[in-house]
């Protein structure tokens, strides 16, 4: 009888320890996921929206529906005759075509 009782206590202790480890793993995974989401949200807040100037930060454009916007630059001649480069975040033509095809496919195939 003592052996069965001792074995039962040992079994309950091991089960308790393993379930505590499992819950710790779940908590750690939740914390990691939450930190990842917070980092993504901060990066999203720091990004440059579509049609806004990106002359000083050419890699900081936000994401669109499918693709990240690209910094597109043009040379502008000012009234004083100086040429300056002006850049804005936009969707390149090949990305627009891909989004059009995907949108069309979604309408057809539901």
From Swiss-Prot:
Tissue note: Expressed by the venom gland.
Subcellular location: Secreted
Proregion residues excised on maturation: 21-44
Keywords: Disulfide bond, Knottin, Secreted, Signal, Toxin
SS bond partners: 47-62, 54-71, 61-89, 73-87
Single Gene Ontology MF annotation: toxin activity
Domain-level remarks: The presence of a 'disulfide through disulfide knot' structurally defines this protein as a knottin.
Family label: Belongs to the neurotoxin 19 (CSTX) family. 03 subfamily.
Protein name, UniProt field: U1-lycotoxin-Ls1kk
Organism listed in the record: Lycosa singoriensis
Taxonomic classification: Eukaryota, Metazoa, Ecdysozoa, Arthropoda, Chelicerata
